[in-house]
């Protein structure tokens, strides 16, 4: 027998050993699309929830250059609040998602109080700074502090902030790198910290450090990718601008040399004007692309939009000797999207099809209801088809096969479709032409039953 | 008369180079892409080749590699809008690397220089 088991247990089993409960809270949170901050909150939650390690309060310091800086402080502000929270959190059947939600709320209202208190705290991470709490990261050791006020190494400002005699310092280490430190106490229950609490807290510290390290690597990678994309864009634009500049410069010099006759002067001026228009177009397309800001998707009449685009294209079709054949289902339901942006998408797709198809050929446009929730618009050209290696790069910015293209058109289309929850598919075979299919989410609720 | 082959995909630039270099006293042939350039090179001899790098169809760097095989002693100038290919080791095989600009002086000087060696 084969039985699928859920990765994510919906709630804590009170019978389970708390080590297991703790591990499951922390590891499960990494499955969630949580932000780095939220995941760190989960770790603090694991350390403070009754079904986890059960400390009263947890504070997190993050490494920032050569400083250890105060971040979050999770926990109740007073014994009364502690009692109330424990009551909430011991509700039977409460899942970890609810606990995290609760803590997020706790943190947001405590932001000015609890976390606000440790935000101004920062300690220098130099080798000779052996005050508490820095020693734990400097020596890479878990430190349990008792009778803190009698211990001269405890930083006075820190002691005043935490206000307890007993606390545990957990360094967050990944290999030899210091990611931060967590400090735990039992300010309200006044229960002495037990050796097994220390063990579990140490384990949490390792997970937290590993997580922070991975998250920071990921962030670096995203930044590097962004820089690489920016570099690619700058290179492409440089090229696109230098070519017309070279042409303009060269033909202008010819004019200035004064050897050109009237016909040549006129020709040069026409070339120069053409290149200036090209530069203008580059600026226009880039600006258009960069300010992309689609409105919230709303239901609109796709067939009316499509018909008006087709109508507007008719004169160009006639002038360039191409036929547009359209088949539009008269009963298309409204679809979701930004009508203006979608209109532009349809126009761009049809213009692309024009440019790909030879004179005298036919472009086919169809719109039909695929099922209860999707409407599909297809635009088929009569071109050569797109070779597979180019197909893979179709939606990459600045990829173009047109001599004067910016390589932003299809990317724009994809962004519009993404923004309205739609799809775009390409079907292309050598010699058979290319079909672009746009999938729109339809809104049939308002449609009378037929 | 020295013969120059220009490989350039932009129509207006082809025209400009042809006029300007002819005025300098060279015999100029233009090719609009790599395939056409290779075809011309197989049947004609030139004293110098000026080529762009990124063009539709076959890549200019690939073209240079192939031309290197065909050209024997013919010097090559890379004339491009891209600065970045200067670091591409394939382009080191070229005799000069000229970045396109609104003045043709540098290109003309490099051509004069290479043809007088």
Stretches with model-predicted labels:
Chain B
Residues 15-23:
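Charged docking surfaces used in two-component/phosphorelay signaling
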Residues 30-48:
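Acidic, metal-coordinating helix/loop segments flanking the phosphotransfer/catalytic sites
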Residues 33, 59-62:
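Acidic catalytic/metal-coordinating carboxylates
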Residues 39, 61-72:
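Short amphipathic alpha-helix used as the core "switch/output" element in two-component signaling
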Residues 52:
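Active-site residues of response regulator receiver
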């Amino acid at each position: 027998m084969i039985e699928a088991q859920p990765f994510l247990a919906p709630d804590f089993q009170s019978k389970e050993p708390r080590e297991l409960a703790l591990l499951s809270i922390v590891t499960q949170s990494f499955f969630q699309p949580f932000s780095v901050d939220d995941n760190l909150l989960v770790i603090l939650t694991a350390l403070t929830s009754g079904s986890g390690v059960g400390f009263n309060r947890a504070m997190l310091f993050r490494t920032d250059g050569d400083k250890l800086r105060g971040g979050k402080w999770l926990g109740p502000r007073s014994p009364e609040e502690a009692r109330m929270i424990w009551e909430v959190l011991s509700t039977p059947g409460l899942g970890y998602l609810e606990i995290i939600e609760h803590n997020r709320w706790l943190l947001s209202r405590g932001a000015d109080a609890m976390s606000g208190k440790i935000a101004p705290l920062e300690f220098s991470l130099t080798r000779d700074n052996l005050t508490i709490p820095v020693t734990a990261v400097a020596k890479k050791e878990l430190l349990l502090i008792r009778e803190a006020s009698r211990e001269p190494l405890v930083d006075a400002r820190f002691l005043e902030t935490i206000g307890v005699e007993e606390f545990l310092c957990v360094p967050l280490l990944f290999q030899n790198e210091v990611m931060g430190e967590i400090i735990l106490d039992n300010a309200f229950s006044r229960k002495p910290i037990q050796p097994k609490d220390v063990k579990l807290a140490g384990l949490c510290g390792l997970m937290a450090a590993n997580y922070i390290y991975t998250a920071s690597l990921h962030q670096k990678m995203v930044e590097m990718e962004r820089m690489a994309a920016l570099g690619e864009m700058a290179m492409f634009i440089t090229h696109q601008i230098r070519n017309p500049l070279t042409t303009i410069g060269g033909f202008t010099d010819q004019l200035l040399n004064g050897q050109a006759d009237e016909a040549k002067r006129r020709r040069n001026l026409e070339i120069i004007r053409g290149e200036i228009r090209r530069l203008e177009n580059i600026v226009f397309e880039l600006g258009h692309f960069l300010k992309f800001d689609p409105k919230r998707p709303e239901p609109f009449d796709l067939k009316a939009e499509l018909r008006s685009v087709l109508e507007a294209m008719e004169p160009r079709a006639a002038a360039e000797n191409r036929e547009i054949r359209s088949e539009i289902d008269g009963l298309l339901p409204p679809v979701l999207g930004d009508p203006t942006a979608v209109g532009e998408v349809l126009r761009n797709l049809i213009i692309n099809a024009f440019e790909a198809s030879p004179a005298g050929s036919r472009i086919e446009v169809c719109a039909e209801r695929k099922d209860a929730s999707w409407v599909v618009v297809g635009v088929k050209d009569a071109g050569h088809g797109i070779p597979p290696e180019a197909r893979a790069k179709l939606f990459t910015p600045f990829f173009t096969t047109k001599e004067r293209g910016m390589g932003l058109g299809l990317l724009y289309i994809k962004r519009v479709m993404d923004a309205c929850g739609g799809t775009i598919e390409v079907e292309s075979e050598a010699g058979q032409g290319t079909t672009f299919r746009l999938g729109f989410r339809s809104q049939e609720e308002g449609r009378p039953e037929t | 008369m020295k013969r120059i082959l220009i490989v350039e995909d932009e129509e207006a630039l082809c025209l400009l180079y042809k006029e300007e270099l002819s005025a300098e006293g060279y015999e100029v042939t233009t090719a609009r892409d790599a395939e056409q350039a290779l075809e011309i090179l197989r049947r004609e001899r030139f004293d110098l080749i000026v080529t762009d790098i990124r063009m539709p169809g076959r890549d200019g760097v690939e073209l240079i590699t192939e031309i290197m095989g065909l050209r024997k002693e013919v010097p090559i100038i890379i004339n491009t809008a891209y600065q970045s290919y200067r670091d591409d080791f394939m382009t080191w095989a070229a005799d000069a690397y000229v970045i396109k600009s609104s003045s043709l002086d540098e290109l003309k000087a490099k051509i004069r220089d290479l043809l007088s060696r």
